[in-house]
Amino acid sequence: DGRVLTRDKVLKGSKKGDAVIILPITKEKNTVLVIQARPNVKEGVSVELPAGYVEDNETKEEAARRELKEETGSVTNQLILLGEFYQDQGISSAYNSSFLALDCQKKYSQMLDKDEFIRYYECKFEEALELLEKGYIKDLQSQYTLEKAKTLVKKGTLIQYK
């Protein structure tokens, strides 16, 4: 009808702001969460999954492997795409990809950016789900990734964790 829309657009990370979220599962069938300083949240810290931006020169799979290594010191030979979603399509074109990383092995020390304060925490998958259900995991991208993995486990289409 000829109307012009004006919208704000938030730019984060790389030019597009695309990000990856990784649910690491170790060879012992544990998962790895990160506890990260988050000054913008009420609690000041957040329990979440390893995550980060896709750099301009890499694929989402390469970004997932890099972030896993940087935040936890772990590597994986098997990445499974769990799903993709827009982070906040009202203000951003950022497109996030959630991965399951199987048979993770800790081989390195963390390689954090100078503005990152992250500790990792290894626990049973069921404990991670309990933290989610009790409201300790509050970021939507970690919630989404854990719920997608939980659905696959219930359907029997994913490795058994017990």
Task: Tell where the protein language model's regions lie, with residue ranges.
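Acidic, metal-coordinating catalytic segment for phosphate/diphosphate chemistry
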Residues: 1-23, 27
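Short connector loops/turns at beta-strand edges and beta->alpha or beta->beta junctions
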Residues: 37-40, 104
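A short acidic/small-residue loop/turn micro-motif
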Residues: 12-13, 39-41
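A conserved beta-turn-beta hairpin within the catalytic core of GNAT-like acetyltransferases
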Residues: 41-47
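Unchanged
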Residues: 18-21, 26, 52-140, 159-161
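Charged phosphate-binding loop/patch that engages nucleotide di/tri-phosphates or the phosphate backbone
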Residues: 143-162
